[in-house]
Amino acid sequence: MASQGTKRPYEQMETGGERQNATEIRASVGRMVGGIGRFYIQMCTELKLSDYEGRLIQNSITIERMVLSAFDERRNKYLEEHPSAGKDPKKTGGPIYRRRDGKWVRELILYDKEEIRRIWRQANNGEDATAGLTHLMIWHSNLNDATYQRTRALVRTGMDPRMCSLMQGSTLPRRSGAAGATVKGVGTMVMELIRMIKRGINDRNFWRGENGRRTRIAYERMCNILKGKFQTAAQRAMMDQVRESRNPGNAEIEDLIFLARSALILRGSVAHKSCLPACVYGLAVASGYDFEREGYSLVGIDPFRLLQNSQVFSLIRPNENPAHKSQLVWMACHSAAFEDLRVSSFIRGTRVAPRGQLSTRGVQIASNENMETMDSSTLELRSRYWAIRTRSGGNTNQQRASAGQISVQPTFSVQRNLPFERATIMAAFTGNTEGRTSDMRTEIIRMMENARPEDVSFQGRGVFELSDEKATNPIVPSFDMSNEGSYFFGDNAEEYEN
């Protein structure tokens, strides 16, 4: 079974290491974020950024994107072989914002990729530090998850916009490795597989020859990753069918869409990590904090602590609400785009609003936007409590598959019961249980029908005071369960465009 070995702590996935004990994991994750921090400080020096400019999240994102681009080998090779007008394949850059005479000005910078790689390696003890790069990719992915909706992408692959809570990590690049795979939602994996199958249907040679053999290996690997996310035997058996298909086609697409729907109730395991912008790690390193010595975890109190003492700024457009901008970034920092708003609100200590009610656009500023009217404000990224991040999908008990929480993919391991109208979801499953997977489909539908909405998931798990770093006194919040707390309801956000 290919999913064996996937149950190691995901900090290990982050650091690519062999099995390590908790202390070693904390040290290697600490080394990773410390390296990001050192790199950021060095870049600020190179660019002569003031302290304030270095804390601007837009500058942080530009610097992060530059290093990701500098190490994107596939794209670099492609750019060298297909030179396009006005693009130097050896250079990378982006907008840097500086404060001049009381105004923000945009300056486009260009750097040799080689130079960026040198600075990155120097900050990471001479290593390529792929784990740190993946960490930045996951931060960007979490930011996209909180900012954009993927309705169009869902519809294009024949899925339903109601499945948006399954789309975590849908903008992660392919090269994000094992750590990237753990944070991808069921819908994201299904979408990647459907795209692959569609190419195979349209292009006769897709599965043929030497290239086809590699394609096939990638296909089976993706199937195994998805299979490892499901927690019931019937869902896994269906994945085996999809993986072993001689010539994947429409039948497999049907099966995958069925499985994605089933994941709305029989939730998959999807990891959540608090990945922060590079400038936050930079600030901590600059103040003398030694991440490797102190140790660090992406799923415990550490990111909350770090955000309690970091001041980060953001550019604000004329009609945007700074509090809403803060909420967006807070959600991205904790990978909470698909969490129940009531849980997020309780932890954050201020109301977290659904996205349709936010007066803010994305964090990044387009090159054609007018800088004259730009202001900046402090992002409020502090929290009232902290909670452990989950990777289970929030099923009430792992022995028998039970109801996960509809339209959310829990981020925090905090007790809640699951308000959902089973009828709405079951309506998606009318009819089609024939075909070669009929027995599995019947079994999955039976499990979904038996899922009890009143079950409590994460029983006894609670949030913790920020002074309680050993997580000794769980506070179990009680929620008003009358309304479903999905961030995506009444949505009017922009679509994600590459």
UniProtKB/Swiss-Prot annotation:
Main localization category: virion
InterPro entries: Flu_NP
Post-translational modification: Late in virus-infected cells, may be cleaved from a 56-kDa protein to a 53-kDa protein by a cellular caspase. This cleavage might be a marker for the onset of apoptosis in infected cells or have a specific function in virus host interaction.
Gene Ontology CC, one term: host cell
Localization terms from the record: Virion; Host nucleus
Keyword Iron: no
Extent of motif Unconventional nuclear localization signal: 1-18
A GO biological process held by the record: viral penetration into host nucleus
Subunit annotation: Homomultimerizes to form the nucleocapsid. May bind host exportin-1/XPO1. Binds to viral genomic RNA. Protein-RNA contacts are mediated by a combination of electrostatic interactions between positively charged residues and the phosphate backbone and planar interactions between aromatic side chains and bases.
Role of this protein: Encapsidates the negative strand viral RNA, protecting it from nucleases. The encapsidated genomic RNA is termed the ribonucleoprotein (RNP) and serves as template for transcription and replication. The RNP needs to be localized in the host nucleus to start an infectious cycle, but is too large to diffuse through the nuclear pore complex. NP comprises at least 2 nuclear localization signals that are responsible for the active RNP import into the nucleus through cellular importin alpha/beta pathway.
Similarity section: Belongs to the influenza viruses nucleoprotein family.
UniProt protein name: Nucleoprotein
